[in-house]
Structure formats: C-alpha cells, structure tokens
Regions:
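Short, low-complexity, charged amphipathic interaction modules
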Residues: 1-15
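Short domain-boundary/entry signatures in modular proteins, especially
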Residues: 13-19, 203
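Short beta-strand-centered segments at strand-helix junctions
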Residues: 21, 26-67, 74-119, 124-151, ...
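Short coil-to-beta-strand transition motifs
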Residues: 163-165
C-alpha cells in the first residue's frame, strides 16, 4: 500500500502539482525578544509540527498592537530565529494600521513596525513586519525533476472552484524542505481555497 501511495505522490509531483498550504498571521521570535516577552529562561513549547521539517507551532501566543487596532493570541512559530519577524496579510495590516512591504521571508530591513505584547513584557518592533511573498518550498530532488532553481519566479494555477493564476511566485530550494506552496488568507480567500488544494506550477 505504501509503495502504491509513493507512486501516486510521485506521479502528482512529476505533473508539477504541489499541495497548497494557507498561512495565518504569525510571528517568529528572536531569543532576546522571547526573554523579554515571556521572562528570563523562557523557551517555546512545541504544540504541533508543521510540514517543513524542524518547524512547529508553539503553545505560546502574543498580542500585536498597531495604530488602529490589535490582534490577540497570535501564533508563534518555532524555533527561535536570529531576528523577530511578523507575517501578516494585507487585510491584517489595514485592520491594525500597519504599513508592511511584500517581502521574502527573512528580508526585513526597512520593513514595518508594530508593538508585540507578551505576558511578561512588551517590545516595540521598529522593523520586521512583512506581507510574505507567496512561495513554493522545493527539495533538491524535486527541483531537479521539475527543472526549477532557487530564487526562480514561476506562475502557479490554483486548482479550486475559483481558479486563479498567481504570477511571480518565488521558488525556494533547500535539502530540508518538503514540497509545499504557501499563500496567506487573503490569497486563499480570493481563490476559494477550502481544504486539500493543489496548485499547478507553470513556468
């Protein structure tokens, strides 16, 4: 049975079809900011593994405060990073009164600002808020099969009841990646994504 499943998954992958995952608003914390928000010696408590190996949803939550509003119980994804990064949808930014650029994850220089509130402290994040560029995580063997390269831009057609073709989708290749496409809730709602959904990579 497992061999049959592997053959089916392989056939889907060779067709350039990728599972689409929807990312809600979340934050990645630096070790320093983690200690400020949750107290000295605090660490993240894994709650559920994510599709990308080594990444997880934590038990801990924070509040985000903008000039027009706040979002409570915002998810923290682990493990900790070298710098704090907040990923919001455009709708989130409008509701919070935050200005954030469309960026690749990790590119936070000159990005948006926000206040992050935890149970033990608050940080005024002067930069680090972005609207994440939609992207596809690709392991090297899949990249070779589909002739994809790291940093390449492609189009992806969302195979839903309201099909949409996203242009300028970023390809990210790494040996630790699982083959998945990530979009935010604004994009998912526009394409009527509901449950298991595939996207077709178009070069």
């Amino acid at each position: 049975m497992q061999n049959l499943m592997d053959q089916i998954v392989g056939a889907i992958t060779r067709s350039g079809l990728v599972e689409v995952e929807v990312s809600a608003r979340h934050i990645h914390l630096s070790e320093r900011d983690m200690q400020i928000l949750f107290g000295d010696g605090a660490s993240l408590t894994p709650k559920r593994d994510l599709s990308q190996p080594g990444q997880y949803l934590s038990e801990e939550r924070v509040n985000l405060i903008g000039t027009k509003g706040r979002k409570e119980h915002v998810a923290i994804l682990g493990p900790v990073r070298s710098s704090t990064q907040v990923e919001l949808s455009k709708s989130d930014c409008v509701e919070l009164g935050v200005t954030a650029p469309l960026r690749e994850s990790g590119d936070v220089k000159g990005s948006g600002s926000i206040i992050v509130e935890g149970p033990c402290g608050t940080i005024n994040l002067t930069e680090g808020v972005i609207i994440a560029q939609n992207h596809v995580h690709v392991p090297p063997e899949t990249a070779q099969m589909l002739e994809l390269k790291d940093k390449q831009r492609v189009c992806v057609e969302i195979m839903s009841e309201r099909p949409i073709i996203f242009k300028n989708v970023l390809i990210r290749v790494h040996k630790n990646f699982t083959f998945r496409m990530h979009i935010d809730f604004d994009e998912a709602n526009a394409a009527a994504v509901n449950g298991f959904t595939l996207g077709k990579i178009i070069k």
